[in-house]
Structure formats: C-alpha cells, structure tokens
A protein has these predicted regions:
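Conserved class I S-adenosyl-L-methionine
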Residues: 90-99
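Conserved S-adenosyl-L-methionine
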Residues: 109-116, 180-182
Length: 197
C-alpha cells in the first residue's frame, strides 16, 4: 500500500483473506492497505484503470541515460543509425565501442527477441553501460569487456553491427564481422574522415 501511495498510482486493491469467512474479500485503496494490521496470508489483485502508457518509439531522450564523462551517441544519430540498420525481430546485434550503451539500449528496447552484444574496452564506460542496461531493465543485452576485434571472436555471428568506436581497429573489426556473416548489415559513425580512409 505504501509503495503504491508513494508512487501516486490511482488504483484499487481487491484483497482476499480468511477465505470462507464473512470478510474474505474486500476492495480498498492504497491508503487503506497501510491500516491493515491483522497478520496472515493475503491474496491481492491491484487494478489500475489509468496505467501510464508506454511510448512506441525507438527514440530515447539523451536525458534518460546515466552519462558521466563517457561519450554517448546522441539521440538524433541513434535514431538515424538504427533506422539505417533495419534491425529484425531475431537480430544478433553487435554494438562495438558501446560507450554509455545508448545504442545497445535503444536496439534492445525494440524487441526482447533481439540479442545485443555491447562491446567496450574502457572500465568507466563498462560500468556506466551496465548501469544504463539495469536502468532500462533489459535482459537481452550482454556486456562484452575487451578490445574489438579480439572480444568478438567467441560471439555468435552478427546479423547487424554498429561501430561507434573502433580504437583504430576498424579494418580488422569489419573483417571479423564479415568473416562471421558476409551479409551482416553495418552502420559506422565517424567524426573524422580518417575513420573511413
């Protein structure tokens, strides 16, 4: 009751106790639940007729992520990059140089059936990425610590890959991706022409 009241959720609770007795079932509101002092086994159904609606968008605002000093792919770039990848329901997706994990999180939220491998070599980024994955309650993201392409060797073949950071190993990373799956679709973000040279 206290948790529901603090969350300011407007709901009713159908509460069952002493089945077979005169007061076996009653309907209460969260504030009344705090007043129940009788110990015993209760069965409750919480009914919320005005739940918060889940947004149907792959776009997550930058403010939603835990940031720190780790680089992050900005919202507009995430949106375009994931759109160009054309992820599918059963995709195996590599996020290489994941940083805060913003791309990994956005991809994983599209479908619980997408398996995301978020690769990062920097300890501070790995910690921040894990916090963001937990914040968004994602079960389909595996954090892979280490330098790509070495960290990719034991992973299943990707159907899609995003390269946000390559540590100077872009050519070798792409070779491993396409060795594992010659048809893998890849998106690369570059802030300098040297990246694609």
């Amino acid at each position: 009751g206290k948790l529901l009241q603090e969350a300011e959720i407007s709901c009713e609770i159908v509460c069952g106790r002493d089945f077979g007795g005169a007061s076996e079932i009653r309907t209460i509101v969260p504030a009344e639940a705090q007043e129940i002092t009788k110990e015993g086994l209760y069965t409750c159904l919480i009914r919320n007729d005005s739940p918060k609606k889940r947004e149907l968008s792959q776009s997550i605002s930058d403010d939603a992520f835990i940031r720190g000093k780790v680089p992050m792919t900005k919202e507009e770039i995430r949106h375009v990059s994931l759109g160009k990848l054309h992820l599918t329901e059963d995709a195996v997706f590599y996020d290489i140089g994941s940083g805060t994990g913003s791309i990994a999180v956005a991809a994983a939220q599209l479908s619980p059936n997408i398996q995301v491998y978020a690769m990062e070599r920097k300890a501070a980024a790995l910690e921040l990425m894990q916090q963001n994955i937990e914040k968004f309650h994602l079960k389909n993201v595996a954090v892979v610590a280490g330098e790509a392409p070495d960290s990719m060797q034991q992973l299943p073949a990707p159907t899609h890959a995003f390269v946000g950071g390559s540590g100077g190993n872009l050519k070798q990373i792409l070779e491993v991706v396409w060795q594992k799956n010659p048809l893998a679709r890849v998106a690369i973000n570059a802030i300098s022409l040297e990246t694609i040279a």
